[in-house]
Design a protein with these regions (language model features):
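Catalytic helix-loop patch of NAD(P)-dependent Rossmann-fold dehydrogenases
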Residues: 74, 79-82, 89, 102-144, ...
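NAD(P)H-binding glycine-rich loop region in Rossmannoid oxidoreductase-like domains
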Residues: 38-77, 86
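Adenosine-cofactor binding site in Rossmann-like domains, unifying the SAM/SAH pocket
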Residues: 21-43
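N-terminal Rossmann NAD(P)H-binding glycine-rich loop of SDR-like oxidoreductase domains
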Residues: 2-20
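Amphipathic terminal alpha-helices
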Residues: 275-294
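NAD(P)-dependent short-chain dehydrogenase/reductase
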Residues: 135-180, 184-193
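Active-site loop of classical SDR/Rossmann-like NAD(P)-dependent oxidoreductases
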Residues: 11, 219-220, 244-263, 276
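Mid/C-terminal beta-alpha module of Rossmann-like enzyme folds, strongest
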Residues: 190-191, 197-251, 292-293
Length: 294
């Protein structure tokens, strides 16, 4: 099956390049496909004529989005709708990646797909607009919300912690934001589970949202401690972590206090549940510190 993947240089796209399930993946990115340029989207989709579109490109600079709301909306809110409408013309369904930031973090349990959405900032609002544009596009779709994404690729929290530990013995990390660390490699596996199901039955689980995140939960400070524990096993950099409240690390954009996602629907419908986040972290650390892999 020919699959068009947007966001060629992102963590999920690079993970899909490894976990492609034997499909023919065509990766697109600017300038060939620019989510802020509708003509480029329509031109690329028509030229590729895919059987499936994976919408993995996004404006992900959460704090900078507060300063560039129009650009963030063009890329996250409007572009996905153009992409999905173009896909609908070719009969291709769309798997669209979204985020925990569509929720305000106020619940005391993991978020379910049908819980009320209430983004706290521009990034979450634009991603929600993208979900709504996909749903209204006329294309068959699955929206996959994920959170706390890391991988061997690109920039992410795991790589930031390792880099900081190369020059610092101690770090302060917020401990009042809880979530599910998610390997982009696991996201790729989840996407391929949807693709496989749709090859058999294109209507299976279509036109709904799903949560796809690492199994288990933690907070940022303990996630950092787990990173350094794995790094120590491999002879990598380590640092002492002190937990602090979010008020001690102010950011332009407010983050949800609770980003935990209930992934039961994904498991029930598509038979995929990501591994425990600790196991996936160890897998990624083997890639990041291969010379000393445990």
């Amino acid at each position: 099956m020919k699959i068009l993947v947007t966001g060629r240089d992102g963590q999920v796209a690079q993970s899909l390049a490894e976990r492609h399930g034997g499909h023919e993946l065509v990766f697109a990115a600017r300038p060939d496909l620019d989510l802020a340029d509708p003509a480029s989207i329509e031109r690329t989709v028509a030229a590729v004529n895919p059987a499936l579109v994976i919408s993995a490109a996004a404006y992900t600079a959460v704090d900078k989005a507060e300063e560039e709301p129009d650009l963030a909306m063009a890329i996250n809110g409007e572009g996905p709708g153009v992409l999905a409408r173009a896909a609908a013309k070719t009969g291709a369904p769309v798997i669209h990646l979204s985020t925990d930031y569509v929720f305000d973090g106020s619940l005391d349990r993991p978020w379910r797909e049908d819980d009320p959405v209430a983004p706290l900032g521009v990034y979450g609002a634009t991603k929600l607009a993208g979900e709504q544009a996909i749903a209204a596009s006329g294309a068959a779709y699955a929206i996959l919300r994920t959170a706390w994404v890391y991988s061997p690729f690109g920039g992410n929290f795991v790589k930031t912690m390792l880099r900081l530990a190369e020059t610092r013995d101690a770090l302060t990390v917020v401990e009042d934001q809880h979530g599910c660390p998610t390997s982009a490699l696991d996201i790729a596996d989840g996407i391929m589970a949807v693709a496989a199901a749709w090859q058999t039955d294109p209507a299976h689980g279509a036109n709904a949202a799903y949560h796809l995140a690492g199994t288990g939960e933690t907070h940022w400070a303990d996630f950092a401690r787990a990173i350094f524990a794995e790094s120590a096993k491999r002879g990598g950099p380590v640092a002492e972590v002190t937990g602090i409240p979010s008020s001690g690390y102010p950011t332009r954009a407010t983050r949800p206090a609770n980003s935990r996602l209930d992934c039961s629907r994904m498991a029930n419908v598509f038979g995929y549940r990501a591994p425990r986040w600790q196991a996936s972290l160890a897998e990624v650390m083997d890639r990041l510190l291969p010379e000393n892999a445990a």
